[in-house]
Amino acid sequence: VALRNLLDKACNSQELKMSYITLDFETYYSKEFSLSKMTTEAYIRDPQFEVIGFSYKVDDAPAQWVTGSNGEIAMALEELDIPNHYLICHNMAFDGAILAWRFGIIPKYYLDTLSMSRPITGLTVGGSLKALAEKFTDGHKGNEVVNALGKRRSDFTPGDLDNYGNYCNNDVELTWTLFHILKKDNPPKELYIQDLMIRMFTDPVLELDRDVLIAHLNNVQDKKAKLMERIDLSIGRDALMSNPQFAEVLKKLGVEPPLKTSLRTNKEAYAFSKTDYEFKALLEHPNTAVQAVVAARLGIKSTLEETRTESFLGISERGALPILLNYWGAHTGRASGGDKMNLQNLPRGGALRRSIKVPDNHV
């Protein structure tokens, strides 16, 4: 409440001046080690992770580029006194998590231009800094990041680092400009909610019970194997490719087969293709047997329950459970799941819910 009141005053008072730091990290990535291949959580917590440098802007001062060893980066961040500033980033889940998990720094307040943009654009523009800068500002995002593929900091020439720094400085200036445009349509109470959602990810508290997860994964895989064995002995796994026979399998599992109107014949037909939304939705059916047969039909090796459990196990090896909810992630305005996980729809009473633990002194 005190934090919310402070933000209310800061946003509505001409007399109270907040001090802002706008920040952007540039990090090592390769074809295999990148956010396109991994979750944000796994990427940042991985031993391969490296900060190439970062740019920062204190209030209206020009953006500055900092590069160096991990120790030098840490020292520069420490000198900025970020815990006593309001931090502005684009895609705060990324930059905020780097600050928190790699350098132990939590700002006074998170202000994320990506979250701020969603209710304004209605999810039609895209959330990239490039797309938003082109819509709301006269600035343009560079493409020097493409030249950084597969390069550690030690692989950059001094000239390359200068160019990368100019690119990063430009990103920070664009983010600062974007923030002032977007904040007009983001009331303090919404900024407060955005901050809370970011903190759920950057400053996680919940832990995962590995014993529960391991037992559950073994149980799910065992049930799937036995189910597929029964199918092999009865109709044969190849029969899953037969629409009528697969429809009977679904009916025996208590699921009414989805239907569609065939474009070719204009007659009703089973909707069992990879492009049929209602059919693909069965991959998330609460009955893991339904998940298994649908996954087998689609040629998917792992069911959703297996994938979720394996994901939880991976997180449990790396630390606490960060929960990323995308503010205004759906067109209705509700939050959506982020970082390839949605803890809003875990099955009630399931093992995944039971695996989430609250540490001592947090209840």
Report each predicted region and the residues it spans.
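Conserved "right-hand" nucleotidyltransferase catalytic core of DNA-directed polymerases
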Residues: 15-33, 46-48, 53-55, 124, ...
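Conserved DEDDh/DEDDy metal-dependent 3′-5′ exonuclease domain
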Residues: 20-22, 30-37, 44-181
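Compositionally biased regions
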Residues: 6, 14, 64-65, 70, ...
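Short alpha-helical segments and helix-capping/turn motifs at coil-helix boundaries
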Residues: 11, 38-39, 70-77, 310, ...
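Structural motif
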Residues: 86, 362-363
